[in-house]
């Protein structure tokens, strides 16, 4: 595996020059109708920058950032080792380090740094410990806490009716939004905090109702070098 956060130009070119069957499965392309944000379109733009044929600007960054990370493009991809979503993430991380960032990202990144949630203070501290130690820790996720807190209440009721010993933690965002906005260092800090708090809870199993958080815990944390302390 290439060094984390290192763009693989060969893989970008493989995608850029492919017949692009994946374009049929890209939800961003289906909604926008813009070839520039099709999987191969984004790969072409990123490859051009990597070869110094183009330089980053807000228009290019906006196009390359139009990726949901759904990985639908991998289903029909003829290159088994190509993960375009990761290559685009690496590109955005490189852009951020070079000082390029979309203004719309900055308020959310600042909220993550200050409150541990992209939504700001209104979600900070909403999930607090209800038991010192338990077999199960329930992780609500910052989007749930901000937009649908009733999901947390319902999950607690289910766990209690099932007789499950559970706890909540004063959770931070899982870190995936920070990665998608190019700040891998911040994503790693959030991951480290969550791993510490979960380990301190004494739980052996983590349950979450957020699919994005589940994917981040199961796939991104190991990739970032964090050993997740529970199943």
Spell out what each predicted region is.
Residues 43-226:
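Iron-sulfur-cluster electron-transfer modules
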Residues 227-231:
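Short, intrinsically disordered, charge-balanced linker/junction segments flanking boundaries
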Residues 1-64:
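Ferredoxin-type iron-sulfur electron-transfer modules and their immediate structural context
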């Amino acid at each position: 595996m290439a060094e984390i956060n290192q763009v693989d130009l060969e893989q970008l070119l493989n995608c850029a020059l492919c017949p692009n069957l994946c374009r049929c499965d890209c939800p961003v392309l289906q909604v926008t109708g813009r070839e520039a944000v099709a999987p191969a379109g984004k790969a072409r733009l990123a490859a051009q920058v990597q070869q110094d044929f183009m330089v980053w600007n807000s228009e290019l960054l906006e196009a390359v950032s139009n990726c949901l990370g759904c990985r639908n493009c991998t289903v029909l991809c003829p290159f088994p080792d190509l993960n375009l979503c990761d290559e685009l993430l690496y590109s955005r991380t490189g852009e951020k380090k070079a000082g390029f960032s979309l203004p719309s990202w900055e308020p959310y990144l600042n909220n993550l740094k200050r409150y541990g949630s992209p939504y700001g203070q209104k979600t900070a501290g909403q999930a607090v410990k209800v038991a010192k130690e338990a077999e199960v820790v329930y992780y609500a996720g910052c989007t749930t806490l901000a937009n649908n807190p009733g999901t947390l209440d319902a999950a607690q009721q289910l766990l209690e009716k099932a007789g499950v010993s559970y706890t909540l933690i004063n959770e931070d965002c899982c870190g995936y939004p920070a990665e998608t906005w190019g700040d891998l260092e911040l994503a790693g800090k959030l991951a480290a905090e969550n791993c510490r708090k979960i380990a301190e809870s004494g739980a052996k199993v983590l349950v979450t109702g957020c699919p994005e958080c589940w994917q981040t815990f199961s796939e991104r944390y190991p990739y970032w070098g964090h050993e997740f302390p529970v199943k």
